[in-house]
């Protein structure tokens, strides 16, 4: 991607949010929260690029669930989510299907998130201002805690 506007309002990856999630008592993966680093919310349909890397390993899109408004979406569904609004004050939970979870310790989380601002046209042919809402954070995960099932917010 060429030029993209960047506004650093918040850390994209929410501190201390990395944890395992369980389904029927079995560790099925891990999750963490992200925020939109922008001054207003947007519909999921304006997200043009979304990727997750953990410890420099790119997570396949089919293993990612983007949880918001009590619903789960795969990144390949974003273009159809024109009624799902991500409020700027609400974090989204990113669930990664990874049976057995991550090993205990620190892990580097990289989120690539580019969206277009639909009220900022920058040229002909329905082109809009791209916005960079990417983020990186190193967080620790432990096996301490419950084995409760985790639902989307």
Functional labels for PLM-detected ranges:
Residues 1-153:
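Terminal leader/tail segments of proteins
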């Amino acid at each position: 991607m060429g030029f993209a506007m960047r506004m650093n309002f918040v850390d994209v990856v929410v501190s201390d949010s990395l944890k395992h999630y369980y389904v029927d008592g079995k560790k099925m993966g891990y999750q963490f929260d992200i925020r939109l680093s922008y001054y207003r919310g947007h519909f999921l349909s304006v997200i043009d690029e979304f990727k997750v890397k953990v410890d420099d390993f790119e997570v396949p899109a089919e293993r990612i669930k983007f949880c918001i408004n009590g619903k789960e979406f795969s990144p390949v569904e974003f273009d159809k989510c024109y009624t799902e609004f991500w409020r700027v004050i609400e974090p989204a939970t990113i669930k990664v299907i990874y049976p057995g979870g991550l090993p205990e310790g620190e892990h580097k989380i990289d989120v690539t998130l580019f969206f277009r601002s639909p009220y900022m046209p920058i040229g002909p042919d329905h082109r809009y201002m791209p916005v960079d809402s990417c983020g990186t954070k190193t967080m620790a995960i432990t096996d301490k805690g419950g084995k409760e099932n985790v639902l989307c917010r």
